[in-house]
């Protein structure tokens, strides 16, 4: 039997579903002040984990469709106000280097998960700063030791979810997927920020996969290489749909290895954000019993159009930037693009 719960902050509301036979999924997103109310009929697990010895339940190379992600079950959730959220942030170390306005003025939600087959325990953490309607999310994965002496991780998502549609719109179909566009940036040392917009149907041709009963295997992935995290691509992109009046903005907050991807499932599109992976960066993390791993943070917002999404991103970055006197009254602006240092 499906159950639901809602997390409300001053700016953003999130709705989640779960069940004895279903993983936790985000099924609602709302920003009442902006008239945003989105529903996600296609339930994507909030956490996807690939580990040695446990692969995908659908043969593919996606960050999603992992067996562990499908098997993780709801084990509880906790809501923290601004004061408690700051105490937790100080304790868990995720924000230990962050001295910002957001750290003292954010609400926090922790969702606990458990996979009985592998003994993996996980906590997915959501944070929203007052006045910045954008959600920061990361996950902590632990080896409980109840099943295996070791668990070797090969990829762990910071965020995964479907595209969604307005609450008052018709359900999504393979045809409506073709109305989405992806805006992303290519980078080079002397040519940063080359933004281009591509209709998703150009990346994912119509295949009538619903006749097979299986989701398509393909994905559009963007990956950092080497130690230059933005040497070729940006860890930031926008998904927009003019017909639905929706626009996602999402980013991976990491100056090391990262990967983001978008793709088409039969019911709807999906996006997934992560740090390093075994496939892309030869990354692995072995967890002994009691060990844990914390993903890089990612963040996302949904607005009515691209301009609105960028406004939310700007408010978010201003809330999370380091506290400094120059934030209130900048004295010097020097745009060197790292080329003159």
Annotated model-derived regions:
Residues 156, 255, 298-300, 337-339:
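Active-site beta-loop-alpha junctions enriched in small/polar residues
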Residues 260-274:
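Short, basic/aromatic beta-hairpin or loop at an interaction surface
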Residues 2-8, 12-16, 20, 24-264:
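Polysaccharide-binding surfaces and accessory modules of carbohydrate-active proteins
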Residues 309-341:
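An acidic-aromatic substrate-binding cleft motif
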Residues 272, 277-284:
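Short alpha-helix capping/helix-loop boundary micro-motifs
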Residues 11, 285-303:
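Short Pro-Gly-centered flexible turn/kink motifs
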Residues 4, 292, 331:
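A residue-level signal for beta-strand positions that form part of recognition/binding surfaces
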């Amino acid at each position: 039997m499906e159950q639901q719960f809602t997390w409300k902050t001053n700016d953003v509301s999130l709705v989640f579903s779960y069940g004895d036979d279903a993983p936790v999924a985000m099924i609602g997103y709302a920003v009442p002040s902006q008239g945003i109310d989105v529903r996600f009929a296609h339930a994507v697990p909030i956490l996807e984990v690939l580990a040695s010895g446990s692969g995908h339940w659908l043969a593919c190379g996606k960050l999603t469709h992992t067996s562990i992600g499908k098997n993780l079950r709801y084990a509880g959730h906790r809501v923290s106000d601004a004061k408690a959220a700051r105490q937790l942030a100080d304790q868990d170390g995720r924000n230990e280097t962050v001295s910002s306005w957001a750290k003292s003025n954010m609400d926090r939600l922790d969702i606990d998960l458990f996979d009985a087959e592998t003994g993996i325990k996980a906590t997915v953490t959501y944070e929203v700063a007052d006045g910045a309607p954008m959600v920061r999310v990361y996950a902590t994965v632990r080896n409980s030791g109840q099943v295996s002496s070791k668990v070797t991780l090969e990829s762990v998502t910071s965020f995964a979810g479907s595209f969604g549609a307005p609450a008052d719109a018709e359900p999504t179909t393979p045809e409506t997927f073709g109305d989405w566009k992806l805006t992303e940036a290519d980078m080079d040392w002397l040519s940063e920020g080359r933004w281009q917009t591509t209709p998703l149907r150009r990346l994912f041709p119509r295949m009538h996969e619903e006749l097979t009963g299986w989701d398509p295997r393909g994905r559009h992935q963007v990956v950092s290489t080497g130690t230059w995290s933005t040497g070729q691509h940006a860890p930031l992109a926008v998904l927009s749909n003019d017909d639905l009046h929706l626009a996602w903005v999402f980013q991976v907050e990491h100056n090391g290895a990262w990967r983001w991807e978008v793709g088409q499932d039969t019911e709807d599109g999906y996006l997934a954000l992560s740090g390093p992976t075994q496939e892309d960066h030869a990354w692995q993390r072995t967890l002994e019993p009691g060990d844990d791993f914390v993903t890089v943070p990612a963040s996302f917002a949904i607005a009515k159009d691209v301009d609105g999404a960028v406004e939310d991103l700007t408010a978010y970055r201003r809330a999370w930037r380091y506290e400094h006197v120059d934030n209130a009254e900048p004295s010097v602006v020097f745009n060197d693009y790292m080329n003159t240092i």
